[in-house]
Amino acid sequence: MVLSGKIFCIMLLRLRTFWLWAIFVSAVIIAVGWNQRERAQPLAPPLPAPVQTTPARALKWSVVKAYPHDTIAFTQGLLWHGGHLIEGTGREGHSELRRVALSTGGVLQKRQLPDDVFGEGVALAGNRLVQISWQNGRAFVWDEKTFAKIGEWKYDGEGWGLTFDGENLIMSDGSDELSFRDPKTFKIQRTLPVTFNNQPLKNINELEWIEGEIWANVWQTDCIVRIDPQTGVVKSYLDCSGLLDNKARSGREDVLNGIAYDTQTGRIFITGKWWPKLFEIAVEN
């Protein structure tokens, strides 16, 4: 059969249109399928911690100076910024975000959390302070200067400690795992199991990023561990027993909880819940 030029062109155009639609529909199906796969695919499980052949080393420390600390403050988070301490406190009805004068322990600025919220760790990411809560599943985002609320995130599970490594917010939840979270969305990017002498280390609490390491206190102890952020291995630790004299303790739940680091001077500050003092300490390398 001989086709005229006009009919042949029409058939080619129709055939071309058919194939374009076929390609388009195929692309949509592939994209939808891939998107569903992406959404359904969970985070990759954390890699197992490497075998630690050398036991964690106990580091020597000494007190450089002691400062007054508000005994009403149930300290849950601590950091140093702009010449002052930023402190997050806990307990329902008493949870606050505070800016504190180092020399006097006086509260220069504060923001009350909702009465039903038990405040926990706090971290500075850019010009925003992020403060988490214990069992409320709420992370509050505050303006660093005014303490005005500028956002809030929801998350699953408990919140204990929080710090920022310059790229991710790092959160503890009382288990032996840390979660690395996007500072813009608070979504988990990866998790890190923590081990101490090849054993899972639970009750990881308040966190501080210090010179490429995660420093953390272990709840219900006076121990501070230094965690490798890549492997989760604790290579060294500080036994801070005796830092606060027993005579200065009230007998309440006043365990060590609060680590702050001055990046400009290298000073390290430590305090605890309801402690009457905050200490600057020096640590051996």
Model regions and ranges:
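A short helix->beta-strand "capping" segment at the edge of beta-propeller domains
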Residues: 51-72, 102-106
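Hydrophobic, well-structured mid-protein blocks that either form specific transmembrane helices
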Residues: 139-197
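Blade-loop segments of beta-propeller domains
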Residues: 105-141, 148-159
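A short beta-strand motif characteristic of beta-propeller blades
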Residues: 63-68, 106-112, 148-153, 190-198, ...
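Beta-strand-rich domains and repeat architectures in extracellular enzymes and scaffolds
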Residues: 64-96, 111-123, 272
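Short loop/turn segments that connect beta-strands within beta-propeller blades
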Residues: 101-105, 143-147, 183-186, 228-232, ...
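Conserved beta-strand positions in repeat-built beta-propeller and related beta-rich domains
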Residues: 86-92, 129-136, 171-175, 216-220, ...
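Beta-rich, blade/repeat-based domains predominating
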Residues: 71-82, 115-125, 155-167, 172, ...
